[in-house]
Amino acid sequence: MKRIGVFGGAFDPPHVAHAALVKAALAELQLDELRVVPTGEAWHKTRTLSPAPHRLAMAQLAFAELPHVVVDPRELERVGPSYTVDTLREFKALWPTAEFFLILGEDQAQALPSWHDWQEILQLAIICVATRACSTGAGAKFDLETTHKSRFRRLLMPALNVSATDIRARFAAHLSVADMVFEPVARYIAHHHLYQTA
């Protein structure tokens, strides 16, 4: 049975912790393939995201060298709000016999009951909860994980405390982002003047 990981996110920008998590997921979950899915019109984001073509290009640059990783643009091409369940349904239709692993951070996993058709998400994929470095209460079980034990597993995430929010702030302040984003991504951001305040 094919094992496919699904890792969604804004990737605004993608950074070294994203890549480390992808590598950890491929190894620990023994995945045949991992689909990196940049978020489309995210219903839960309060911040305006960078334009889709930029986020797609940065994701392609960030994950280009990783084997078995495919950057999947389907959510960016979707019209209207982008829901994870729709993406999983599409994947299930493409690979009906595959086993799917949805990779989420702890904060996302705890918010899962607020997601569109979240019960179906639990049927379509195993939820792999990545514990962030230095997170408060890291590793503590939450209600849904306790009540749906068979649909959850923990994914040990490398201890890299890097955030896209910090990276955007550093670009805006013209500070170094060395060791936070890959050089091709940093060059792309600089070339397109992303994250610059007016």
UniProtKB/Swiss-Prot annotation:
| Cleaved signal peptide residues | none
Identify the EC number(s). Answer: 2.7.7.18
What's the protein here called? Probable nicotinate-nucleotide adenylyltransferase
Q: Does the keyword Transferase apply?
A: yes
Its pathway, per UniProt, is: Cofactor biosynthesis; NAD(+) biosynthesis; deamido-NAD(+) from nicotinate D-ribonucleotide: step 1/1
A Pfam family recorded for this sequence: CTP_transf_like
Biological process annotations from GO: NAD biosynthetic process
- Primary role: Catalyzes the reversible adenylation of nicotinate mononucleotide (NaMN) to nicotinic acid adenine dinucleotide (NaAD).
Annotated GO molecular function terms are: ATP binding; nicotinate-nucleotide adenylyltransferase activity
What NCBIfam families does the record point to? nicotinate (nicotinamide) nucleotide adenylyltransferase (TIGR00482), PRK00071.1-3 (NF000840)
